[in-house]
């Protein structure tokens, strides 16, 4: 345990000043995402999505951000997955973008809303064909006997859909997370981190600085 407790580093890659924080959190998110992409971080759109089950037990998993805008953050998934079942019972979720290599992270709380079939179909048809086929193969979050079962099913589906378009599975869709709060964290020297949180009040965003 002592070896783990000795692991530390200083955060020296920047500061976040009040005058540099815009009124709209999506403007800041867009600016930070550009920094992330320019820094060539692997999987810059990877985000942890947390849901809770009917007993209040939290679960997390990594998904990829596929769109964001004034309305919120979008991801796609199997609608029979554990996270989709959780969202059906409790649509309150949280998202974390862990950009640790550049001393930044963004934490979001919000409500997950199902996307329209039109938007889901548009994105599904933009995916590589192999990814479309994989959506048919995996009954996400259910137990399987071995990886071989997945590979066999994939081969079967690949043959089945060898010609023409792969249809959209009824059990595949996506969510828009409408944010209620968005917190930006910038690592600071001597652990004096900069934290700003935006909270949605009506149609407006209220911005506050938080102690580290």
Swiss-Prot record:
List required co-factors: FMN
Q: Which InterPro entries match?
A: Pyridox_Oxase, Pyridox_Oxase_CS, Pyridox_Oxase_N, Pyridoxamine_oxidase_dimer_C, Split_barrel_FMN-bd
Among Gene3D superfamilies, the record links this protein to: Electron Transport, Fmn-binding Protein, Chain A
Residues that, per the record, bind substrate: 8-11, 66, 123, 127, 131, 191-193
Subunit structure of this entry? Answer: Homodimer.
Kindly state a single biological-process term from the GO annotations of this entry.
pyridoxine biosynthetic process
State the function annotated in the UniProt record: Catalyzes the oxidation of either pyridoxine 5'-phosphate (PNP) or pyridoxamine 5'-phosphate (PMP) into pyridoxal 5'-phosphate (PLP).
Q: Mind listing the UniProt keywords for this protein, alphabetically? A: Flavoprotein, FMN, Oxidoreductase, Pyridoxine biosynthesis
> According to the UniProt entry, where is the signal peptide?
none
Name this polypeptide is given: Pyridoxine/pyridoxamine 5'-phosphate oxidase
GO MF, one term, reads: FMN binding
- Which pathway is this protein assigned to? Cofactor metabolism; pyridoxal 5'-phosphate salvage; pyridoxal 5'-phosphate from pyridoxamine 5'-phosphate: step 1/1; Cofactor metabolism; pyridoxal 5'-phosphate salvage; pyridoxal 5'-phosphate from pyridoxine 5'-phosphate: step 1/1
Q: Determine if Oxidoreductase is one of this entry's keywords.
A: yes
Query: Gene encoding it?
Result: pdxH
């Amino acid at each position: 345990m002592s070896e783990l407790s000795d692991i530390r580093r200083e955060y020296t890659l920047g500061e976040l000043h009040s005058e540099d924080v815009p009124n709209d959190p999506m403007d800041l998110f867009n600016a930070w995402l550009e920094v992330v992409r320019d820094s060539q971080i692997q999987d810059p759109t990877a985000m942890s999505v947390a849901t809770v089950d009917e007993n209040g037990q939290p679960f997390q998993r990594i998904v990829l951000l596929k769109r964001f805008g004034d309305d919120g953050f979008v991801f796609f998934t199997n609608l029979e997955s554990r996270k989709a079942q959780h969202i059906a019972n409790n649509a309150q979720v949280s998202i974390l973008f862990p950009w640790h290599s550049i001393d930044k992270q963004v934490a979001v709380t919000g409500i997950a809303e199902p996307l329209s079939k039109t938007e889901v179909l548009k994105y599904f048809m933009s995916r590589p064909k192999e990814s479309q086929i994989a959506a048919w193969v995996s009954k996400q979050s259910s137990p399987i006997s071995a990886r071989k079962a997945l590979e066999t099913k994939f081969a079967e589906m690949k043959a089945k859909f060898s010609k023409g378009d792969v249809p959209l599975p009824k059990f595949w869709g996506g969510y828009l997370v409408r944010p209620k709060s968005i917190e930006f964290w910038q690592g600071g020297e001597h652990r004096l981190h900069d934290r700003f949180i935006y909270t949605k009040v009506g149609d407006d965003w209220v911005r506050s600085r938080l102690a580290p």
